[in-house]
Every structure is written in C-alpha cells, then in structure tokens.
Amino acid sequence: MKAWIVLMLALSLPVAAVAEEAKEGEAPKVNYITLSPPFVGNYGLDGTPKLKVYKADVALRVTGDEATKAVKANEPLIRNQLVALFAQQTTETMNNVEAKEKLRQEALKQTQQVMTDETGKPVVEDLLFNNLIIQ
C-alpha cells in the first residue's frame, strides 16, 4: 500500500512541475481600464464670457492583475488629478492634435505620479483618450 502511494506521488510530481513551468512561462495579461463615467467639465477659465466644455473618455493600460487592482483601488485619486489637469487647460492646449498629444502625455505622467506615490510603482503604462470632445 505504501509503495502504491509513493508511486502515485512520484508520478504526480512531474505533472505539477510542468504546470508550474507553464504558469511561469505565461506572459502577464495586458488590461485596459476605462475610467467611468467620462470626464466632463469646464476648461479655459480665463475670464471670457463664453463657457468652454470638455468631455474625455480615458482608458489606462496596465499589465497584470495586481496592477489592475492597484489602479482600481486608487481610481478616485487618479480622477481627481485628471479633473484638475483638464480644468487648467486653455483653448490653445485643447485645439490641435499636437497639443492634445502633449495633454495625453502630461495626463499619463501625472497618473503615474499618483500611482508611484500610493504604491511605490508607476503601474500605468499608457493613457489613451478614447474620445476627447471640446466645445
């Protein structure tokens, strides 16, 4: 009976080792986290009578489940930072493609700073504007 148990254990060890190697060989999963609801607010608060409004649909790219959990746990801080950034913009920084790319890069930088402050790692690899409407 003992021999049978030892034999079964011996046969199951290689299977467990192969399964562990498969887990180690897997590439971490890339996740896109959409910050919902979309950002809507005013920008260009320079004293002109015309109200300027933006709507931004933002997604964050992270790798791995731990990074996804960290971003979701800190989403209110990220949203606060992005709302403040969008509100600081002027008509010039929202009106052309190059300026929008600079805004995207600054939003990514600030998001990474929030995550570094909270978790010790930037975690967010990229920030994407799925939609950016200005009026």
Can you annotate each of these PLM segments?
Residues 1-135:
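Flexible, low-complexity charged segments
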